[in-house]
Amino acid sequence: MTVQTFNPDKVLVSEKKDGSFTKQMTDIIMKDVAENSVVMQLGQYHEMDGLQEKTVYVQTDGVSAYWVNETEKIKTDKPEVVPVSLKAHKLGIILVASREALNYTWQKFFEDMKPQIVEAFHTKIDEAGLLGHETPFANSVAKSAKDSSQVVVGPINYENLLKLEDKLYEADINPNAFVSKIQNRSALRESRDGDKKTIYDKATNTIDGITTVDLKSKQFKKGDLLTGDFNSLIYGVPYNINFKISEEGQISTMKNSDGTPINLFEQEMVAIRVTMDIAVMVTKANAFAKLTASAENV
């Protein structure tokens, strides 16, 4: 018996309204997501071999506490390799398109929707893994900083940037990256020592010589910075990306200009729900620190 495979060049969207993207389509999306996601740029990738949960191994330093699964933390008294359970959770996004899309081949529809899918996923991954916003994960970079009491409250200036780094140095952590946002650059340029030398190099986008990556997210407030050892941030992706097309119902998370929810049938639109499983985990408990302008953002 011949197994029928999904050929996106020949199958119309109306003929296949749910299923999984082909491996090639998933690879294309994940390549673009990885190039834009801060978690994926700075974190350490682990192959999950198609498993929802996978044991990976982490080298400890004999001083710090380490998360070995989502709820259990251990502390070792000497450097050793410990098993860590990396568990994937589902992240979903919803996008809308004209009902005309039902007449497209899946290949054309995929090419049209790919930029939106990529942007939505890398934003979702970063907000969950870095900020802990609407996250299925047990920990995040920001939560790690808060739980370790490694938060500096105050404006971006030379003194506070040094205090931020000192939080990590006191824990014997060498930061290898900062996460900032473009709106912070003017404050960073004005962060100068007594000799009027700036700690920020705009030509290389580095703070105190350390790589700085800008996060584009409304959830990451102006004046906030994250820093730490991003080798302690690990992630994995076990499966292909899944999709489901809907033609009826309301999209409560999306609004028309008048504030009413989008009604797919009445407005002749379709919605595509795209889901992926991804694991994101902070392994070293005190690996990160945060600078925030407001105590409300701690």
Stretch-by-stretch model annotation:
Residues E15-I93, N157, A287:
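Assembly/oligomerization interface modules of large self-assembling protein complexes
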Residues G92-A171, K290-L291, N297-V298:
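Alpha-helical scaffold segments that mediate packing/assembly in large oligomeric complexes
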Residues Q24-V38, F109-M113, I117-A120, K124-I125, ...:
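Short, Φ-rich (hydrophobic/aromatic) sequence segments
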Residues Q59-T60, A97-R99, I182, V274-M276:
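Residues immediately flanking
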Residues V63-A65, N184-R189, A279-V282:
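Flexible loop/turn segments at secondary-structure boundaries
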Residues V151-F265, V270, M276, V298:
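Extended oligomerization regions of viral-like shell subunits
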Residues M1-D27, N36-V38, Y45, P261-V298:
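Protruding loop/beta-arch "assembly-hinge" segments enriched in small, turn-prone residues
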